Amino acid sequence: MKLVRKYPYKHYNRFSDTTGRKYLVDSVKVPSVTTILGATKDKRFLDNWRRKVGNEEADRIMRQASTIGTEMHQVLEYTLNGQGYYNAMEEGAKPRMMAKTILDNIKIEEVWGNEISLEYQNKFAGTCDLSALCYGKPSIIDWKQANKPKKEEWVEDYKLQLGAYYLA
């Protein structure tokens, strides 16, 4: 897919410190949207799940989900940049399948940018996965990976994240 440079997106350097992920925006250290949301969300569900499955299993599941999510993002980013990406290793199969399912089920007409830094009045910043024209409408997309469907109340942070990106 061809990249259309519709907006002059800036790039902000991202780094982590003891308080979480931050971006350097015009010499100001600005917290990331995900750091803010992580600090304000109710962690009881995650804590209960960790107690139920045990720390070792919870860590294994989280590492596996992170690996699959990162790989899926790579496939989507490179594909939408027109470069193509293929991890022939066994761990690449599931992310490829997930990315293909996404791309087969979304109508992306123009790609305006991948991995775009966004910031709002030096208050917060983040990186959205895709800015594009989808179904004839300007869209901000942040890809999410899950091994099974999530309940509506479990994705509230995702909606808040996209709302913050929309403001930026």
Identify the meaning behind each predicted range:
Residues 112-168:
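Mg2+/Mn2+-dependent nuclease catalytic core
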Residues 1-125:
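Metal-dependent nuclease catalytic cores that hydrolyze phosphodiester bonds in DNA/RNA
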